[in-house]
Structure formats: C-alpha cells, structure tokens
C-alpha cells in the first residue's frame, strides 16, 4: 500500500452537540478543513494549465493545531489574501496542497491569486538544492565565473522550453 497517510475521519461528522460535549470534557482538538467528498477539484496552474484532483484523494487537513496555533498552510493563505498577493510562485513539492488552497479560497469567498508550480532545482546528487549544502545564491555562481545571462537562461528554461527546442535565449527573449 503506497498511499500517503490520511486522516481517518473519525470526528468528521460529529454533531454540534457532540463537539460541544468533547470540548466541555476538556478533550484536545484541532480544526480541520472539511474537504467535499466524491467530486473533482479543478485548479489552474500558470505553467501546467488545468489540473484535476479527485477530492477523495485529499485529506481533511488541519487548519488550527491543538495548541490553537494556525498551521503554516492556513496562515499562508490568510496572509496572501490580506497582503493582496496576485501571483504565487512555488516549487512542485507544493502541488499536492494546491486543491486544498483553492477550496479554502472558495470557502472564504476570496479571489485566488494565480499560481505557478516550478520544478525544483536539484543538486549534484539529485536532492533538493539547499543552502545547507552549498551554493544556492546567484552570487555564488557569479563568483565561480557563471555569466548573469547564463544563470537567467538556465532559470528561464526550468520546466519549460520554446516549441522549437531552442536552448539559448537572449536577455530580451
């Protein structure tokens, strides 16, 4: 079984009275996003276009932890809305949370920013590039003699290429 761990839903359908009783009894709790079941969540990524997720594959993920602190993902959505963020650029590893984000925006009645998920830049051993493991800043590569145009060209072609398979682009392109 290669499925990711998923919330079992044991408290998903508690009545208001049952919830109030558990709180009155001092039981710890979290607040989760209740994902609609048996439907598709359609999102648009600026790089990939339309992506469809089956809601049954999504987890009712935690929004507020048992200590009352919002999760990073929840706080991030609220912050992006309050800051009027129009575009979100992030790595592929966040693609699985994209439908949950879309559902949160919809739940709040907020306009969702445009999202683009880019492939990760990997290190020599195939792992995610990390500042803990060496060069990650543009200045590091410039110090090693890489031209600014080469760095821009490399980044411009991450996860995309022109229809003619051109590998070298001018700065104007």
Label each region the model flagged.
Residues 133, 137-173:
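A conserved active-site cap/scaffold subdomain adjacent to cofactor or substrate pockets
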Residues 1-131, 137-140, 162:
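Active-site cores that bind ATP or allylic diphosphates and position pyrophosphate for catalysis
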């Amino acid at each position: 079984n290669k499925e990711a761990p998923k919330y079992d839903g044991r408290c998903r359908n508690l009545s208001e009275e049952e919830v109030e009783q558990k709180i009155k009894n001092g039981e710890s709790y979290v607040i989760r996003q209740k994902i609609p079941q048996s439907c598709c969540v359609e999102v648009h990524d600026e790089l990939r276009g339309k992506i469809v997720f089956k809601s049954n594959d999504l987890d009712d993920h935690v929004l507020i932890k048992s200590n009352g602190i919002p999760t990073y993902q929840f706080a991030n959505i609220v912050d992006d809305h309050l800051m009027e963020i129009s575009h979100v650029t992030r790595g592929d590893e966040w693609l699985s949370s994209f439908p949950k984000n879309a559902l949160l925006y919809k739940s709040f009645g907020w306009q969702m920013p445009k999202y683009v998920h880019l492939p990760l830049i990997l290190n020599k051993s195939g792992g995610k590039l990390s500042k803990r493991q060496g060069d990650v800043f543009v200045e590091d590569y410039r110090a090693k003699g890489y031209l600014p145009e080469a760095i821009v060209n490399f980044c411009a072609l991450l996860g995309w290429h022109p229809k003619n398979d051109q590998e070298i682009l001018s700065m104007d392109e």
